[in-house]
């Protein structure tokens, strides 16, 4: 209280000084003013506080019981989610869809494409890489088996584009329980260029996509990981619109805010890294024990002081076999992965969905101030859907190929089914991926289970580069 007394008394006290006659009696004498500070009690200090703050403290003391504190905390939590919407929208405008100019000084890129099976869009997706407008790159296609029907698709493209450096690598290398990492290992070892781009077979690449990612990579000397924010190429049909709306709203919101805050949220469907930086972390083989290898790539790099960022153009998923059921299974698999890697998300993740957060806000305000639950929940839904539509408009950067009515219908359906997807994922923690079943230990490591199918074994690179 001594410091507070000094501040108050500086303005409140009376000062006594020598008379002017005494001050001029001699030029050699300098009079120092003497201040007298009266004592001020704590109660007097409180009286100087703003009345609103003081009354607010009294209200909190008299009215904030346990349930009120819980309701207030819930309302604050949901208010933060409202802010997340705003940050995501404006950050998307700031970061996405910028034009990039060709730069021949950028490093070469080795594109690794792990492939299992085919669909009617595979040819289009793979050819988009053959036609990339980049001065120096190679394409490395990875297959577990020489019997894979997609091999003929790749061979036909290699024949059609003989000027593009491309290879087919078979059967992988057994470095862990993750079949995707095993599949990519020969390509990673054979990569000739400083930058490595891991791209899923269902990704359609814009002509300037590789250029965009390489430009972002070289924008900072410490940059070592660049990903494309997941989105979807325009396709016809309800199922495709369902997937596109999810990746343009709920997923995009968290991905953008995570990157804005510097949180690692890397997606492996289109991820570029500096090979030298990953080698310093132990190379790709070190991550064969993790199922979410993409996340742990970025985590290992950033833990060594490297930077991670998103490029300006989204990753355009273009699978021909998507259905609502397969989408639900995919989202459930991601939930299981996140919970295994970060167990605290088991509590936080379901609360940040639109429906659950709306109920928290509605009942919280009803308890604290008697506001209508229905009106509050309705306003919450309206705000959420308007902000989601605005964000998706920014992600799309053009016209939608579905009607606003379909957007509203799919959005409501997805939001109201989201809690059930989470519950199902928690109750059935085994992950089914391709033809394999996995169980994860805390931290994201793969552990074997009695019902696990055998992960395809791999052989050395000498078995084949075509």
UniProtKB/Swiss-Prot annotation:
For this protein, the Enzyme Commission number is 2.4.1.80
Tell me where the sequence motif D1 sits in this chain: 148
Q: Residue ranges for motif D2?
A: 200
* Keyword list, A-Z: Glycosyltransferase, Lipid biosynthesis, Lipid metabolism, Membrane, Sphingolipid metabolism, Transferase, Transmembrane, Transmembrane helix
Query: Membrane-crossing residues?
Result: 70-90, 354-374, 403-423
Tell me where it resides: Membrane
> Highest taxon of the source?
Eukaryota
Pathway annotation from the record: Lipid metabolism; sphingolipid metabolism
**A GO CC annotation given for this chain:** membrane
Chain location of the short sequence motif D3 per the record:
294
Give the GO terms filed under biological process for this record: glucosylceramide biosynthetic process; nematode larval development; regulation of protein localization to basolateral plasma membrane
Motif (Q/R)XXRW: chain residues: 330-334
What tissues has this protein been observed in? Expressed in excretory canals, pharyngeal intestinal valve, intestine and intestinal rectal valve.
Per UniProt, what is the membrane topology? Multi-pass membrane protein
**Any notes on this protein's domains?**
The D1, D2, D3, (Q/R)XXRW motif is a critical part of the GCS active site, involved in catalysis and UDP-sugar binding.
Q: Output the PANTHER family linked to this UniProt entry.
A: CERAMIDE GLUCOSYLTRANSFERASE (PTHR12726), CERAMIDE GLUCOSYLTRANSFERASE 1-RELATED (PTHR12726:SF1)
Family per record: Belongs to the glycosyltransferase 2 family.
Output this protein's name. Answer: Ceramide glucosyltransferase 1
| Protein source organism | Caenorhabditis elegans
Upper taxonomic classification of the species?
Eukaryota, Metazoa, Ecdysozoa, Nematoda, Chromadorea
């Amino acid at each position: 209280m001594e410091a507070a007394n000094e501040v108050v008394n500086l303005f409140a006290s009376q000062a006594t000084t020598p008379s002017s006659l005494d001050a001029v009696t001699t030029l050699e004498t300098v009079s120092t003013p003497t201040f007298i500070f009266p004592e001020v009690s704590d109660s007097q200090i409180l009286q100087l506080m703003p009345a609103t703050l003081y009354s607010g403290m009294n209200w909190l003391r008299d009215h904030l019981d346990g349930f009120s504190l819980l309701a207030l905390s819930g309302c604050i939590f949901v208010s933060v989610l409202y802010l997340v919407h705003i940050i995501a929208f404006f950050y998307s405008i700031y970061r996405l869809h910028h034009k990039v100019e060709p730069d021949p000084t950028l490093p070469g890129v080795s594109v690794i494409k792990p492939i299992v099976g085919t669909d009617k869009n595979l040819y289009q997706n793979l050819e988009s890489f053959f036609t990339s407008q980049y001065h120096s790159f190679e394409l490395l296609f990875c297959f577990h088996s020489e019997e894979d029907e997609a091999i003929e698709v790749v061979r036909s493209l290699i024949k059609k584009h003989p000027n593009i450096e491309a290879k087919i690598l078979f059967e992988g290398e057994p470095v862990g329980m993750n079949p995707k990492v095993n599949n990519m290992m020969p390509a990673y070892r054979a990569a000739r260029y400083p930058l490595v781009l891991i791209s899923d077979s269902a990704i359609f690449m814009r002509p300037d996509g590789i250029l965009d990612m390489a430009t972002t990579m070289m924008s900072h000397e410490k940059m070592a990981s660049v990903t494309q924010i997941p989105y979807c190429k325009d396709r016809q049909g309800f199922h495709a619109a369902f997937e596109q709306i999810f990746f343009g709203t709920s997923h995009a919101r968290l991905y953008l805010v995570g990157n804005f805050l510097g949180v690692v949220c890397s997606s492996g469907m289109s991820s570029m890294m500096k090979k030298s930086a990953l080698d310093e972390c132990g190379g790709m083989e070190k991550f064969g024990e993790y199922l979410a290898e993409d996340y742990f790539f970025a985590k290992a790099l950033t833990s060594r002081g490297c930077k991670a960022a998103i490029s300006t153009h989204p990753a355009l998923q273009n699978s021909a076999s998507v259905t609502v059921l397969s989408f639900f299974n995919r989202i459930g698999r991601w939930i299981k992965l996140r919970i295994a890697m970060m167990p605290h998300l088991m509590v936080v993740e379901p609360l940040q969905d639109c429906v659950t957060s709306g109920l928290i806000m509605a009942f919280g305000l009803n308890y604290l101030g008697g506001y209508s639950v229905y009106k509050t929940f309705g306003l919450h839904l309206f705000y959420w859907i308007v902000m989601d539509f605005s964000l998706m408009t920014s992600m799309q950067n053009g016209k939608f190929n579905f009607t606003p009515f379909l957007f509203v219908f799919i959005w409501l359906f997805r939001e109201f089914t989201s809690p059930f997807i989470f519950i199902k994922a928690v109750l059935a923690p085994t992950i089914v991926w391709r033809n394999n079943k996995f169980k994860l230990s805390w931290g994201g490591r793969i552990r074997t289970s009695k019902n696990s199918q055998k992960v395809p074994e791999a052989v050395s690179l000498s078995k084949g580069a075509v």
